[in-house]
Amino acid sequence: MNNKHPKNKAKSTTTPKTIALNKRARHEYHLIERHEAGLELQGWEVKAIRAGRANLGDGYAYVRDGEIFLIGAQITPLIQASTHVVANDRRTRKLLLHRHQIDTLIGRVQREGFTLVPTAMYWSKNRVKMEIALAKGKQAHDKRHAEKEREWQRDKQRIMRAHNRNA
């Protein structure tokens, strides 16, 4: 009896697979609120993303004509990308959100002076999604304070590990 679908088979989890992270965003901004957005991509961009050629380091989102666009994020084209299409690796890409989300984000950016920063790009159900965050820029003293806090947390962990080993 060859059973193709065993009952005790572990169910697959639908955890999103991370493509790219913007680690610099946490260092340079206070991240207030996060939102998931789709991306309007061309075919060569999806192939390049599958090959792991995305970089969010210099990216940010801006508002134009009631829509939100991503600028500065780099998707490096593959060598075998189509020859009849000019591949611009830093082109402006439209972010896909619901109208009420767009209105909320636009209001907070214009009234309260927030910035929209991409923090992560990942796969969700075979679609590329981007996590964007409402953010406020950090001052130099904020960055120093955050670095001191991280160092203290590392030292604390080191001390606890040494103490637990000796106990």
Swiss-Prot record:
Gene3D superfamilies per record: 2.40.280.10
Keyword RNA-binding: yes
GO molecular-function terms, A-Z: RNA binding
Keyword Cell wall biogenesis/degradation in annotation: no
Sequence segments annotated as region (Disordered): 139-167
Basic and acidic residues bias locations: 144-158
InterPro entries hit by this protein: SmpB, SsrA-bd_prot, SsrA-bd_prot_CS
One Pfam family matching this protein: SmpB
GO process annotations (BP): trans-translation
Keywords of this entry: Cytoplasm, RNA-binding
Function: Required for rescue of stalled ribosomes mediated by trans-translation. Binds to transfer-messenger RNA (tmRNA), required for stable association of tmRNA with ribosomes. tmRNA and SmpB together mimic tRNA shape, replacing the anticodon stem-loop with SmpB. tmRNA is encoded by the ssrA gene; the 2 termini fold to resemble tRNA(Ala) and it encodes a 'tag peptide', a short internal open reading frame. During trans-translation Ala-aminoacylated tmRNA acts like a tRNA, entering the A-site of stalled ribosomes, displacing the stalled mRNA.
Family to which the UniProt record says this protein belongs: Belongs to the SmpB family.
NCBIfam families: PRK05422.1, smpB
Protein name: SsrA-binding protein
